[in-house]
Each structure stands twice: as C-alpha cells, then as structure tokens.
Amino acid sequence: MEKTVYFLGAGFSKEAGGLVQNEIIKTILDEDFTRDNERLIKAKNNFIGFLKEELHIYEDHYCSVQLEDIFTPIDRCVWDGLSIGRYSARGLVELREEFNALMGAAVNYSFQKNRACCDYIDEFAEYINQVARQRMEDGMDRVAVITTNWDVMFDHALKRAIENGHPEKLSVVDYCCYVSSWEANDDTIKPGLLAVGYGGYNIKLLKLHGSMNWFQCPMCQRMYVRFGEEIEIMKAAYCRHCRKNYGMSEINSIKLQSNLLLPTYLKNLSNIQIKLVWQNAAIELSEATRIVFIGYSLPSADFEIRQLLA
C-alpha cells in the first residue's frame, strides 16, 4: 500500500493572508494591530521594551531581527534559571507565555486584515478528505499531513470537508495527541482511534509547533481544542475539569496556556502533548512511500525536523 505524507510550512498559508516568519514582527508593530485591546497593548509594549532594553536593538532594526535571536536568549535563561536585564527566570517564563500569545494574535490579525483567497486550501482539504475516507471501505491508512504552522485555516477546512461529506459514522480531524473539547457538549472533537474503532475515519494533522486553537492546563495536562469560532488568545480561561474535580476557583495553577513552539534553537519538546505529536510524526514519516513538501524551507532553527527526516 502506498502512503503519502504532506509536509506544510508557512508558505502554504501565505496566499491566504498568512505570515512567513520575517513578517511577524512587522505585523506586531502595525499601528492597527492592538485595536485598543489592553492585553495586546501591554504585550506589545513589553515586546518592544525587551528588544530595546534587554537585547539593545535599535528601533530602525526591529523588523530585521530574527525571531530565533529573541527567543533563544529567553529560553537559555529559563532553562538555566538565570535573569536577563529586568527579568528574573520566573519573570521570563511569564514574558514568554505573553509573547506566545502575541505571536498567535499577529498571525490571526494578518488573516483578518488581508482576507485573501483561500479556495486552494479548501480544495486541498477536500482532496485529503477524499483519500482519508477510503479507510471506511478497506481499512487502509493512505495519507497524513504534518505542518509547522500555528494557524487553523487548514484545520477548519478539513473539518468542513468532513462535515460536507456527511459521513454516517464518527469522523474527525486527528491531532494525534490527547485532546478535550473546549465546549463540554461538543461531540465532534474525539480521538482519532475512537473514530476508526467506530468504523469511521480520521484525518491525521500533526502540528509540530503547536496550534492557535490548542490550550493546555498546566495541572492535568489536558489540551483543549476548538473549531469554527475564534478564541481570544489573550483572554484568561481555566480548566473546567480541574474546577469540577478539585473544586478549584479561577487560579493560575489551572489557567489554560497557549501551546505554541516559537522559533528558537532551544525548543522545549518535553510537553507531553507535543511529545506525542512528534512521536506520531516520526511513525507517519517512516511509513510513507512519498513525502510532499509544500511551502516549507527547512530553516536552520528547525534542526530537530532534520533529525526527524533522517
């Protein structure tokens, strides 16, 4: 049996209004980006302040800075328990989480601002769905998609393709890790193996660098997923399971965190959900008879992916 794995990079979403890496800082500096959102304004000011005060970068050079040169020093200090400038190691952890959300908000803003044609994304999703749903007939696993993109354009397109096909049995977008639905009564977000066990099918979408619709509880490690409706990335939300099971109020120990791996030479792959994604990506690549790269340039900071492909 032949199996194709498609590997998508930032270039895949570019025509639909997405950002490639060297455009993210420029977008953050856009005057209309914050839209009077106090959380975004605070995060943006902290980001600019870090470039100026801690990294000693001149204002006219902001847009030419590589993201790896910003996040690698932060990660080095966090790992070693060191301070940098005004920030303690603990303060850097909080700052990094704030920058995580800021990057995601910048990507989201770009899609809303540009609103370019995304028909090609829908067409590709329909094609992937047609191949994947053949599994209901013969049980063969023919296709998987691996991506380094944070955006959810393709995720939503896959879900629409599944729903438009009106499958009689449970069929899902499968992130190949353990997920919980954002809404308690959302039955469309289920594990891929459960769908296959029920006689349906799954479309494997392995997001190596996390996703804008993934939010994780630091206590129970559950990862919440939501489709269709934009989640305000900077807004506080809390784990409903921990609140129920432990009788907890809205406290930081169960505050949901964005799950994005930012460009850095010191990526932390110890997160239990990210580990599962990478492990399953390695399995998919080992089973592939063909690997198709779309819009991915294998940047130097992605040396872990070079190892994955070896």
State where each predicted segment sits.
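Active-site periphery "cap/insert" segments of enzyme catalytic domains
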Residues: 4-7, 46-219, 272-288, 293-294, ...
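An N-terminal structural lobe/cap that precedes and organizes the functional/catalytic core
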Residues: 1-39
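Amphipathic alpha-helical scaffolding segments
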Residues: 21-30, 162-163, 223-229
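A short, N-terminal amphipathic alpha-helix
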Residues: 40, 44-45
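Cys/His-rich short segments
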Residues: 207-266, 270
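Charge-rich, low-complexity amphipathic helices
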Residues: 29-30, 34, 230, 303-310
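Generic structural "secondary-structure junction" signal
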Residues: 14, 21, 214, 262-263, ...
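Short, surface-exposed, polar/charged, turn-prone segments marking secondary-structure boundaries
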Residues: 33-36, 232-237, 295
